[in-house]
């Protein structure tokens, strides 16, 4: 039998022994030094969006890789992306997120003012006061105040064709295409002997704003080069909406549209020449939209 004093002494001995061992372990254990982070200032992080989806096959051990690539060549759709177990591969997810981010940036950023200055495009703004209002109030994106229109009072009126550029839902579309499409379009029209009014830029503009421009300038044909709503395939797609004798409140069926103007669709220079041909036909037939037989 142990007495109470014996138990106390035993507990004290155990505690002393444990403390001695812990102290020895702390002294014997080397202190790990933090590893410095090495930053390669000359290193380049590859841009995943530069990879051509049509040639990038991510399926492991495909049954027929050649036929798979032939199919991918004809579409930018996300096929042949492969799986890691039941999940998408990391590269697939990163590309999806990168493309989605690019689409968001295209909507919420403004067109680079240096490009507008370089193209000598005077800027006016619709009745939208911000990007948020532009998204939530499309009706205001179709209206332009008299004060804004007065900025263009020195511009020639009643030309055969009035062209202008607008950001629409993609500022990136304007930045990527306007330098090529606008000169090609004007050159094509002037080559046909068609008079063209001086182009300008409408900020926060919807397609319907072209009707206000049509009435203000009195041109026979009005053409707006506007950024399309971006998607996961491209954020740089532009469209041309063209109308003969446009008026505020006219039906949408009176507009002719040339869409998918981007490097992966119709190239900007080619689109400019094609639009010039359409406008020439409009002036000859005095019609646009469904009334114009192309």
UniProtKB/Swiss-Prot annotation:
Ribonucleoprotein found in the keyword field: no
Name of this chain's protein: Ethanolamine ammonia-lyase small subunit
Function according to Swiss-Prot or TrEMBL: Catalyzes the deamination of various vicinal amino-alcohols to oxo compounds. Allows this organism to utilize ethanolamine as the sole source of nitrogen and carbon in the presence of external vitamin B12.
A GO term from the CC aspect: ethanolamine ammonia-lyase complex
Cofactor descriptive note: Binds between the large and small subunits.
Superkingdom: Bacteria
EC number: 4.3.1.7
Keyword Lyase: yes
Listed pathway(s): Amine and polyamine degradation; ethanolamine degradation
Entry keyword set: Bacterial microcompartment, Cobalamin, Cobalt, Lyase
Binding site for adenosylcob(III)alamin: 207, 228
Catalytic activity of the protein: ethanolamine = acetaldehyde + NH4(+)
Family matches, as HAMAP family: EutC
Family: Belongs to the EutC family.
């Amino acid at each position: 039998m142990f007495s109470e004093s014996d138990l106390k002494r035993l507990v004290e001995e155990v505690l002393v022994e444990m403390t001695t061992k812990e102290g020895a372990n702390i002294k014997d254990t080397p202190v790990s030094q933090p590893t410095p982070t090495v930053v390669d200032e000359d290193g380049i992080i590859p841009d995943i969006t530069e990879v051509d989806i049509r040639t990038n096959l991510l399926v492991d051990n495909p049954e027929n890789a050649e036929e798979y690539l032939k199919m991918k060549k004809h579409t930018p759709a996300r096929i042949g992306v492969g799986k890691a177990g039941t999940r998408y591969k990391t590269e697939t997810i990163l590309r999806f997120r990168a493309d989605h981010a690019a689409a968001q940036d295209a909507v919420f950023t403004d067109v680079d003012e240096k490009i507008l200055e370089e193209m000598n495009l005077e800027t006016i703004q619709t009745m939208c006061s911000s990007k948020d209002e532009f998204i939530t109030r499309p009706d205001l994106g179709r209206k332009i105040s008299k004060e804004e229109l007065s900025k263009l009072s020195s511009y020639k009126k009643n030309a055969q064709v009035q062209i202008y550029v607008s950001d629409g839902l993609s500022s990136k579309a304007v930045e990527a295409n306007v330098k090529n499409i606008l000169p090609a379009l004007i050159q094509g029209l002037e080559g046909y002997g068609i008079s063209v009014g001086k182009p300008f830029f409408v900020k926060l503009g919807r397609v319907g704003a072209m009707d206000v421009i049509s009435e203000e300038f009195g041109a026979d044909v009005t053409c707006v080069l506007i950024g399309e709503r971006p998607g996961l395939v491209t954020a740089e797609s532009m469209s041309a909406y063209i109308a003969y004798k446009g008026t505020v409140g006219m039906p949408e069926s009176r507009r002719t549209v040339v869409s998918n103007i981007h490097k992966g669709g119709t190239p900007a220079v080619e689109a400019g020449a094609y639009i010039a041909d359409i406008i020439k036909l409009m002036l000859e037939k005095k019609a646009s939209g469904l009334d114009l037989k192309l």
